[in-house]
């Protein structure tokens, strides 16, 4: 099996349904769950939501798989708590890199398909947070932090953000960490969703998708 053959990786469980995936995540103490969005019994979105909401599974990351990068259900998976996605025909080496990226605590985002997908899905009005909670949270960000968040939302990594804003990579990383703390975001994937839903970034504006 591909994952078992990779250094430092071990498959600790497999599941045929979303409900089984949640149960296996609990019983096997997995570090990461590779989740198919379309599964019987309980779809991958709801399974991801349950894993993210389970205090006993804190720290378990979810990487979702989809057949097409136009599958807008991926956005719902990111909202539910997934840390990224890959299409099923991804090259084996890229799949392993993606697993390593998410397992290390980063979100699997890129300026390409992920940003385009999120932008398309969020063109429809999102359900606003109660009492304008998201915009109010953004008020706690400094001007520089808003700039950094906007670049995160476009899929830039810390090194790219540093280059764009003439910062050191460490400073860029520190800004991202502070933003995540202020917005109570799990990871960069959630920061992307928050940036679009709050209106900080709009599709097609200033180079956004």
Enumerate the language-model features and the residues they cover.
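Acidic catalytic/metal-coordinating carboxylates
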Residues: 17-20, 43-49
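Recognition helix of helix-turn-helix DNA-binding domains
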Residues: 155-190
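Basic, Lys/Arg-enriched C-terminal extension of HTH/homeodomain DNA-binding domains
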Residues: 180-209
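Active-site beta3 strand of CheY-like receiver
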Residues: 28-34
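Short, flexible helix-to-coil linker/hinge segments that flank and couple to helix-turn-helix
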Residues: 74-79, 84, 89-143, 147, ...
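Receiver (REC) domain active-site loop signature in two-component systems and cognate sites
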Residues: 39-40
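Short hydrophobic/Thr-rich beta-strand motif most characteristic of the beta2 strand and flanking loop
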Residues: 8-16, 24, 185
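Active-site residues of response regulator receiver
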Residues: 36, 66
């Amino acid at each position: 099996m591909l994952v078992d053959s990779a250094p430092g990786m071990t498959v600790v469980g497999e599941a045929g349904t979303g409900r089984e995936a949640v149960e296996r995540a609990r019983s096997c103490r997995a570090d990461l769950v590779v989740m198919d969005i379309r599964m019987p019994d309980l779809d991958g979105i709801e399974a991801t939501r349950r894993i993210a909401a389970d205090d006993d599974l804190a720290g378990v990351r979810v990487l979702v798989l989809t057949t097409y990068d136009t599958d807008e259900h991926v956005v719902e998976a990111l909202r539910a708590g997934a840390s990224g996605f890959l299409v099923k025909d991804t090259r084996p080496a890229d799949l392993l890199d993606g697993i390593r990226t998410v397992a290390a605590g980063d979100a699997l985002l890129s300026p390409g398909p992920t940003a385009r997908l999120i932008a398309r899905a969020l063109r429809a009005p999102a359900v606003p947070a109660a009492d304008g909670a998201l915009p109010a949270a953004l008020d706690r960000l400094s001007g520089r932090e808003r700039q950094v968040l906007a670049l995160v939302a476009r899929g830039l990594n810390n090194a790219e953000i540093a280059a764009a804003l003439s910062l050191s990579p460490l400073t860029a990383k520190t800004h991202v960490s502070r933003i995540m703390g202020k917005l109570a975001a799990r990871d960069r994937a959630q920061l992307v969703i928050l940036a679009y839903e709050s209106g900080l970034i709009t599709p097609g504006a200033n180079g956004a998708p």
